[in-house]
Amino acid sequence: MSIIISKTVKQELPEEKIRKAIELVLQGEKCEAEEISAVYCGDRLIRKINIEHLAHDYPTDTISFRLNSGNAIEGEFYISCDTVRRNAQEYESSFENELLRVTIHSVLHLIGFEDQSAAQKAEMTQKENRYLAALFHHDEK
């Protein structure tokens, strides 16, 4: 499995934790991955991607693209560090914690989870919380 982490922003990223978060979700959901590309960018790029692919003229925290339909996931996701920073302040969380939550959320989307309904959102939030707790518990060992 290949995990490619790249960024278009100067923000320092906890790359080891990002990689571990991706691996935890895949293992926990019993999924295999061929290649996952994680791109950490700013609002300008994610807004452009939203306009081109979803007809949304505003930035979002993440956008995920599954690139295949096979068993082993090939996909990419983009996360706006600008939006993550604003959300972290709004939710009274650290930037790193919110970044890892959105990373987990993005991987769940690649696996096929949706968040269109209240029930779907609740399921994804529950999974995000579980994987975040597992990630931080793993760091304490």
Swiss-Prot record:
What is this enzyme's EC?
A: 3.1.-.-
Annotated positions binding Zn(2+):
H105, H109, D115
Describe the function of this protein: Single strand-specific metallo-endoribonuclease involved in late-stage 70S ribosome quality control and in maturation of the 3' terminus of the 16S rRNA.
Q: What is this protein called?
A: Endoribonuclease YbeY
Matching PROSITE patterns, A to Z?
UPF0054
The signal peptide annotation in the UniProt record is none
The coenzyme or cofactor needed here is:
Zn(2+)
State the organism of origin.
Chloroherpeton thalassium (strain ATCC 35110 / GB-78)
Subcellular location per UniProt equals: Cytoplasm
Q: Which GO terms describe its biological process?
A: rRNA processing
What is an example of a GO molecular function annotated in this UniProt entry? zinc ion binding
Please report which protein family the annotation says this sequence is part of. Belongs to the endoribonuclease YbeY family.
- Domain of life of the organism encoding this protein: Bacteria
